Amino acid sequence: LHMIHLHWYQYPPMNPMMYPLLLIFMLFTGILCLAGNFVTIWVFMNTKSLRTPANLLVVNLAMSDFLMMFTMFPPMMVTCYYHTWTLGPTFCQVYGFLGNLCGCASIWTMVFITFDRYNVIVKGVAGEPLSTKKASLWILIVWVLSLAWCMAPFFGWNRYVPEGNLTGCGTDYLSEDILSRSYLYIYSTWVYFLPLTITIYCYVFIIKAVAAHEKGMRDQAKKMGIKSLRNEEAQKTSAECRLAKIAMTTVALWFIAWTPYLLINWVGMFARSYLSPVYTIWGYVFAKANAVYNPIVYAIS
């Protein structure tokens, strides 16, 4: 009880019908996510042609998403069944930590996937090819930095607390002290605004490079009086462009999923009167459901 902010006590209990809806939604997304990401990992690890340095990043993304749902899904089912957090204060902190950790690892893995596409498509032969050693180093950097940021609340820089209808736990965005808020300012920059800026920058140049390449191909085909100039090299470039589109889709879905939860954090800091348990819990659940999208995107592609 000492971890629950007084803001949540002013609201009446949530409509009992909401809990079965949350339970069904989490059951559906949990099974879909665990199965989809497991299949993604299995296929990429057991298909020789897919065991490339770039796909190590894809496997890391699937592992991060799998871990998120594996740790979020069962506790959420329990708390929705009992209509409140029943797993104790320690597990609340662990739960909040793991959710933040996996979300942070996912977006920075996507940033490195985007950067690899930028290197291949924009820089071309001038770019340094991604090696297994370099991809492994990137993955190590992702997890070390994510761990460092997400462990900070355990040492007094912000904290993990129950939120919304008290069936989930996350960072404390209702405390007004400057120390707690400073963490959210910096963390928002680190896991949202900076990745978004890098991604937009890379894809602006990727789109320009692809458009220039396609125009060059069409012009050359016209000069030669043929319909298409799709030789082996062109087919390879086309495949790289498809991979860039897949990466862009996964990144876009991540930002669509996590933007409502970011807004909840900032509304909690500056306009908490607009923050209700219903909006908060659905924003929270929608963000976690992002772990479902990636295997679907890769399967369709």
Curated annotation (Swiss-Prot):
Q: Which Gene Ontology MF annotations are present? A: G protein-coupled receptor activity; photoreceptor activity
The biological process GO terms on file are: phototransduction; visual perception
Query: Residues on the Cytoplasmic side?
Result: 44-55, 116-134, 205-245
The domain of life is Eukaryota
Extract the Gene3D superfamilies matched here: Rhodopsin 7-helix transmembrane proteins
GO cellular component: a single term: plasma membrane
* Keyword Cytoplasm found: no
What CDD domains does the annotation carry? 7tmA_photoreceptors_insect (cd15079)
Disulfide feature = C92-C169
Q: Where are the transmembrane segments?
A: 19-43, 56-78, 93-115, 135-155, 183-204, 246-267, 279-300
Q: Which residues lie on this side of the membrane: Extracellular?
A: 1-18, 79-92, 156-182, 268-278
Q: Where is this motif: 'Ionic lock' involved in activated form stabilization?
A: 116-118
The record lists glycosylation at N165
In its record, the post-translational modification comment is: Contains one covalently linked retinal chromophore.
An example Pfam family from this entry, by short name, is 7tm_1
Keywords attached to this Swiss-Prot or TrEMBL record, sorted alphabetically, are: Cell membrane, Cell projection, Chromophore, Disulfide bond, G-protein coupled receptor, Glycoprotein, Membrane, Phosphoprotein, Photoreceptor protein, Receptor, Retinal protein, Sensory transduction, Transducer, Transmembrane, Transmembrane helix, Vision
According to its UniProt entry, what is the function of this protein? Answer: Photoreceptor required for image-forming vision at low light intensity. Can use both retinal and 3-dehydroretinal as visual pigment. Light-induced isomerization of 11-cis to all-trans retinal triggers a conformational change that activates signaling via G-proteins. Signaling via GNAQ probably mediates the activation of phospholipase C.
Q: Kindly state the subunit structure of this protein.
A: Homodimer. Interacts with GNAQ.
- Name the record gives this protein: Rhodopsin
- Gene name for this UniProt entry: RHO
